[in-house]
């Protein structure tokens, strides 16, 4: 009886052990062992060494992270895809439970040595250790990359500038006889693909054009694929914070020309406008990109605006100086006329007064007392009349001089307005021209 129960227990254990699947016997494990057991990642995966391995590339721009104008660097986030065929990693799916695709560690496989020529910093990408391999041996390696690349950034048309930065992919060691490059998608699809781009940033993606060419060098001919990333700056924030305040200050300065040229408050007003513009320019200096190659047009715009404000203030000071000198020279004339002896002598001769060298008798001196009072009164009246007449002449000259100053002020205002208009048209034309290039 004991022997019977022992045999039954052994049979049950055997059945259970046979029914439990072993991990090493699964189709996926058997396929992985078969593919990697005798695989050598140091060797390019072709049976015929004379055939080149074609690597198909694709690029999708996700965002523009930073544009460093001073150091001429562009930082972008891209989705990079490369596909190639490994002839040593193909299998018959019917022998492995119809497995069409598996994931394998990239470190265990041969991978093309594709680099970006414009790299100026360490490539930053998440650690994705696996790639997909299908039954025909096609390997798909997809990963996001943060690319910090060198780019010739032109800020002449800031903030309406358009930048064209290239990302050139090629093998660092293998020539075109060993590794060739191709496009994973149609070029038109690559150029117009903007679905993944973040439009809420400072930059707008215009296009991603792509070209294929062979670079010839002393080490051999290398296949290259170049993606030209064309981006345009969104100018609204800079127009609101930089251009519109400057335009308002210039319009306020133009309004000051309607003040009378002899008004001293006009100079105070223009001085306050100039000081305010200087403070505004200093506070907004960090908003304008600095480039050693060229000066942005907006920098020229600020400089010319400040020069025009200084010119406007200088013109008003010059007009006030002319008017003051005319008044100062006119105020001295009545004093000279009152202090002179010619009018007194003429008055005495006109009234029949005797000269100082003629002696009169006592009888005449007695009867001359009322006559002397009348003559003194007439002399004072004549002096006042001459003084008023002189003042009227001076006032008339001041009025005439002020009229001349008004006309001169209008002439300078028209010249100033013409210069400002010509400068505005020229600047807008240059901005429009450079933004299209």
UniProtKB/Swiss-Prot annotation:
Residues 22-238, 283-292, 432-437 are extracellular. Glycans are attached at residues 25, 92, 134, 283. One of its GO terms (cellular component) is serotonin-activated cation-selective channel complex. Residues 1-21 form the signal peptide. Residues 260-264, 314-410 are cytoplasmic. Residues 377-409 are annotated as: HA-stretch. It catalyses: Na(+)(in) = Na(+)(out); K(+)(in) = K(+)(out); Ca(2+)(in) = Ca(2+)(out). GO terms for biological process: inorganic cation transmembrane transport; serotonin receptor signaling pathway; serotonin-gated cation-selective signaling pathway. It is found in: Postsynaptic cell membrane; Cell membrane. GO terms for molecular function: serotonin-gated monoatomic cation channel activity. The chain crosses the membrane at residues 239-259, 265-282, 293-313, 411-431. InterPro entries: 5HT3_rcpt, 5HT3_rcpt_B, LGIC_TM_5-HT3, Neur_chan_lig-bd, Neur_chan_lig-bd_sf, Neur_channel, Neuro-gated_channel_TM_sf, Neuro_actylchol_rec. Disulfide bonds join 151-165. It is a multi-pass membrane protein. It comes from the Eukaryota. Keywords: Cell membrane, Disulfide bond, Glycoprotein, Ion channel, Ion transport, Ligand-gated ion channel, Membrane, Postsynaptic cell membrane, Receptor, Signal, Synapse, Transmembrane, Transmembrane helix, Transport. N-glycosylation is required for membrane localization. Forms serotonin (5-hydroxytryptamine/5-HT3)-activated cation-selective channel complexes, which when activated cause fast, depolarizing responses in neurons. Forms homopentameric as well as heteropentameric serotonin-activated cation-selective channel complexes with HTR3A. The homomeric complex is not functional. Heteropentameric complexes display properties which resemble that of neuronal serotonin-activated channels in vivo. Belongs to the ligand-gated ion channel (TC 1.A.9) family. 5-hydroxytryptamine receptor (TC 1.A.9.2) subfamily. HTR3B sub-subfamily. The HA-stretch region of HTR3B seems to confer increased conductance to HTR3A/HTR3B heteromers compared to that of HTR3A homomers. This is 5-hydroxytryptamine receptor 3B.
């Amino acid at each position: 009886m004991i022997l019977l129960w022992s045999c039954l227990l052994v049979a049950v254990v055997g059945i259970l052990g046979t029914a439990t699947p072993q991990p090493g016997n699964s189709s996926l494990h058997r396929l992985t062992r078969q593919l990697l057991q005798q695989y050598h990642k140091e060797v390019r995966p072709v049976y015929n060494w004379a055939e080149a391995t074609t690597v198909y590339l694709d690029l999708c721009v996700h965002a523009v992270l930073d544009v460093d104008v001073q150091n001429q660097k562009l930082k972008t986030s891209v989705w990079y895809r490369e596909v190639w065929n490994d002839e040593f990693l193909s299998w018959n799916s019917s022998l492995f439970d119809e497995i069409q695709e598996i994931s394998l560690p990239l470190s265990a496989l041969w991978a093309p040595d594709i680099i970006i020529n414009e790299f100026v910093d360490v490539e930053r990408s998440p650690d994705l250790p696996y790639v997909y391999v299908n039954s025909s041996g096609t390997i798909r390696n997809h990963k996001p990359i943060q690319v910090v690349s060198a780019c010739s950034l032109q800020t002449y048309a800031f903030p309406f500038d358009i930048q064209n930065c290239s990302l050139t992919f090629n093998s660092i060691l293998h020539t075109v006889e060993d590794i060739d490059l191709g496009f994973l998608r149609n070029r038109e699809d690559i150029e117009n693909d903007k679905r993944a781009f973040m439009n809420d940033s400072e930059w707008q993606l215009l296009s991603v054009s792509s070209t294929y060419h062979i670079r010839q060098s002393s080490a051999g001919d290398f296949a290259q694929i170049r993606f030209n990333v064309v981006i345009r700056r969104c100018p609204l924030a800079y127009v609101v914070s930089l251009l519109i305040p400057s335009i308002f200050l210039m319009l306020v300065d133009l309004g000051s020309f309607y003040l009378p040229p002899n008004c001293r408050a006009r100079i105070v007003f223009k001085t306050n406008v100039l000081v305010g513009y200087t403070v505004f320019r200093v506070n907004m200096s960090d908003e304008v990109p600095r480039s050693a190659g060229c000066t942005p047009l907006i920098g020229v715009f600020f400089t010319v605006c400040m020069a025009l404000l200084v010119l406007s203030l200088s013109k008003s000071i010059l007009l006030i100086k002319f008017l003051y000198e005319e008044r100062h020279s006119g105020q001295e004339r009545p004093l000279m006329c009152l202090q002179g002896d010619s009018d007194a002598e003429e008055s005495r001769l006109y009234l029949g007064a005797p000269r100082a060298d003629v002696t009169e008798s006592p009888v005449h001196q007695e009867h001359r007392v009322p006559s002397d009072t009348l003559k003194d009164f007439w002399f004072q009246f004549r002096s006042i009349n001459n003084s008023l007449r002189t003042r009227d002449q001076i006032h008339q000259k001041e009025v005439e001089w002020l009229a001349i100053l008004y006309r001169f002020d209008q002439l300078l205002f028209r010249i100033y307005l013409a210069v400002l208009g010509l400068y505005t048209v020229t600047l807008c034309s240059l901005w429009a021209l450079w933004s299209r290039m």
